[in-house]
Amino acid sequence: HDIYSIEDLAQLIYDLKQINPKARVGVKLVASSGIGTIAAGVAKAKADIILISGHSGGTGATPQTSVKYVGIPWEMGLTEANQVLTLNNLRHQVTLRTDGGIKTGRDVVIAAMMGAEEVGVATTAFVAMGCIMVRQCHSNTCPVGVCTQDEKLREKFTGTPDKVVNLFTFIAEEVRQILSELGFRSLNEVIGRTDLLRQVSKGSPNLDDLDLNPLFVQADPGKNKRYCEHPKINEVPDTLDQKIWPDIEKLIDQNKTIETEFEIKNTDRAVGTRISYHLYKKFGNNKLDENYLSLNFKGSAGQSFGAFAIKGLKLNLKGDANDYVGTVSYTHLTLPTTSPV
């Protein structure tokens, strides 16, 4: 991977929002100490969803060292992230999601009270379909046929959609019962309401010595909501593509092979990415000629020049380029051999 800092992540989010401006971008963070600071950085990078993943979940293909020693409970990571986002006036801009051991309706309600609008249920759903958790998902030897391509083993699979539907029906019913007992009409009413939680004595000095009060701290959202009431796509600044696309579209409508030239600066990031989005929206999966649209640029290109670009778009640069040139790109990119990349 090439994500080593919040800045790298922000660039990836920017690129993804250029190739599909209608998609919500989510970032998964492993619950750990200090996750609040990271979550704030992710929110400032314009992510739409932040997933706080606890240490109890994970695929069977996960290394045993990761299963045993990586991460902390989702409750600790979620509350810290929720508190820091709220204190920095960022909480209402992003949707918080959590997973990693969510099994019951009670877990769902507690997650909501600790700040999550959404929860993920994966391992429990697999168990409902017949998974026995032998943790060899990557070996193609799943004995119950849940995770294998072996035809003989797949014959042993007994899972049906109804089993998963029943699981989530019972989870939803338990959520409804708990909310009814507490006097609330919807799950939204309890999001961020840590004041509804308290630590229960276990009757053992070793267990009661654990102080859970930091989990119950309720940060003041000020004038903002305690959660993201109306999930929306966080917008990022426009690129050079948006400025030049109207002219290109006019030429496309004339049904001609197009070749044009533009000046480019190092602040022009992800050039060619939004144009690829427009081309795909216009032509779909219809294959374009390799040199259908040829764009010539002169200057210093910013990061992600030609990222996620599609076949049929040709980008020629006279100058130099920054990081992430041609990331996951199917376009024809040309740069002079004397240019530093």
Please give the residue ranges for each predicted region.
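Feature marks extracellular polysaccharide-active and adherence modules
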Residues: H278, K298, F308, N316-D320
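Alpha/beta enzyme core
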Residues: H1-R97, R106-E118, D320-Y324, Y330
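A glycine-rich phosphate-binding loop feature that marks nucleotide/adenosyl-phosphate handling sites
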Residues: L29-T37, T95-R106, A128-M129, F184-V200, ...
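Short, T/G/N/S-enriched strand-turn elements that build extracellular solenoid repeat scaffolds
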Residues: I275, F283-N286, G302-A309, D323-V328
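Conserved small/polar residues in nucleotide/adenosyl-binding loops
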Residues: T331-T337
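The right-handed parallel beta-helix/beta-solenoid scaffold, focusing on the short coil/turn
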Residues: N291-L293, K311-L313
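Terminal amphipathic helices with adjacent charged low-complexity linkers/tails
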Residues: N188-E235
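Phosphate/diphosphate-binding loops
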Residues: P73, Q83, R91-L96, K103-A128, ...
